[in-house]
Each structure stands twice: as C-alpha cells, then as structure tokens.
Design a protein with these regions (language model features):
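Internal helix-turn-beta structural module
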Residues: 78, 86-140
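Glycine-rich anion/phosphate-binding loop at the beta-strand->alpha-helix junction
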Residues: 1-103
Length: 140
C-alpha cells in the first residue's frame, strides 16, 4: 500500500513488466499474476472493471491489482506468485545417471528445505519493493 499513481509505462517498462521480471528472477517462481489475475480472465469486462468513484480516482474494487495499462493507479499492488516444490527432497527418486549411462536411483544428501514457499514470501516482497523503487527512480 502507499504506492503513488503514475509509476510505469504503457509498453515495455510497464509496472507489471518490471515487477514480473524481478519476480521471475527468484529461483522457483513459475507464475505471476496481478489483481484477480487468471480468475479475472474468466469474467466479463462488465463484471470486473474497477469503477472509479470520486475525483481523486479511487475505485470501488481493485481487480487490476493496482496497475492499469502498465501504470500504477494508487491502489494497493496485489501480486501473487506460484512457487514450484523444491526438487531436492529426501525421498529416493529415479533419474538419468550420466556416469553409468542409465536411469538409476538418486538420493539427495545433505540438509535441504522441504518447502521454500515460506522463505520465498520475504524475497518476493523485497523484489516487489525493489521494482517499485526502480520505477520511482526512472521518473527522474
């Protein structure tokens, strides 16, 4: 919250593009959506348009997730990411062994996070903050 309106550009350096670029740089991130995202894509425009309710530009809803046409609109930035499960698990798996030239059992040793999603939340929030700072600096 507290993001000013007018950060971003309509093309290439849109607020969504800059944020998504940073988020997809986080290992394990496989998807990014803004506002009502993929669910909103199933609805009609008349059902999900964010109605402006006053001269300051406040909206009744925030289906766009704080960004319209690539530019922040003053609403809260709402972004969600999908993080893949960690592949380094303690269960035996089967995979190709290049030394032996065949599919063989693999057991990953050492200490690994069973779930990276909890740690990813802090990193995702930081990346969004850095993205917004970058957009603010581009304003001049």
């Amino acid at each position: 919250s507290g993001v000013p309106y007018s950060l971003g550009e309509p093309f290439f350096d849109s607020a969504e593009s800059v944020i998504a670029h940073m988020l997809f740089s986080v290992p394990g991130v496989k998807g990014v959506e803004f506002g009502d995202g993929f669910e909103g894509a199933k609805r009609r425009g008349s059902e999900r348009n964010d109605m402006i309710i006053n001269a300051e530009g406040a909206t009744l809803t925030n289906n766009e997730g704080g960004v319209n046409g690539g530019i922040t609109n003053g609403n809260d930035i709402v972004v969600r990411v999908a993080v893949k499960p960690t592949p380094s698990i303690s269960l035996e798996q089967r995979t190709y062994d290049f030394e032996r030239g065949e599919v063989a059992p693999l057991v990953v040793g050492g200490r690994h996070d069973a779930c990276i999603a909890r740690r990813a939340q802090v990193v995702v929030e930081a990346m969004v903050a850095l993205s917004l700072a970058e957009l603010r600096l581009r304003e001049g």
